[in-house]
Amino acid sequence: MMGRFHRHDDGTVHTHEHDHHPHDHDHGDHSGYETETQRIDVLEEIFAENDVRANFNRAAFESNGIRALNLMSSPGSGKTTVLQATLDELAGEFAIGVIEGDIATDLDAAKLSGRGAQVSLLNTSNGFGGECHLDAPMVNRALPGLDLPALDLVIIENVGNLVCPAEFDVGEHAKAMVYSVTEGEDKPLKYPVMFRSVDVVLLNKIDLVPHLDADVDTYIAHVREVNATATILPVSARTGAGMAAWFGWLRRFAGDPED
């Protein structure tokens, strides 16, 4: 069985492992089967095509004076709750568009409606790898659902998954992730791909720390082991604790000269 394919920062793709199965037949040519090299070539082509479309998306944003943020997390981290609070705070200051990615349903999109932002829903169940991430062609298909010339900021809420979304450029200018204390302090060490890729980490649900065997400093230290430069913001989207720092980061990112 082939191992999982992974893309490095330089664009190269490789498998992590090859699972050997017990048998005594010859490992010669298996007619009709792709070799590992052939499969890697196909994946590199997919990534290359994705990067072309990502650059197209980024150019579309920039031609309209838009800053785009890719917001990622594992399922249940509180990403949508963070986004709700963000719209409530900033929609009066910036014209915000949201591309809401989910495998199915419009539940999260419905939570964001009526908060002063344009929302374009993107269900991913039919796309390549769509069960676990957004890619640039998917985001491109969502753009007609937004009035780009009217916007200042687009937030792309990616599918809840701790690995795959970080490997696909969707045309953003920065990546952010929501990481909740309920996920455990070891996640940056066990699943470093996303943590390495982001510009800002929101350590969410800190209001639950008194009820957990958890130490915020340990969470932060583990993030620092894999990403020495990311901004780390302990927050509670539910209570509002620490969220002012996140709003300030977004204001600077979106180009507000007053912040």
Where do the model's predicted regions map?
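Conserved C-terminal guanine-recognition region of P-loop GTPase G domains, centered on the G4
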Residues: C164-H173, V178-T229
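Canonical P-loop GTPase G-domain recognition
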Residues: L208-D259
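Histidine-centered metal-binding segments
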Residues: M1-Q38
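Nucleotide-state-sensitive switch-loop elements of NTP-binding domains
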Residues: Y33-M72, S77, T86-H173, G184-D186, ...
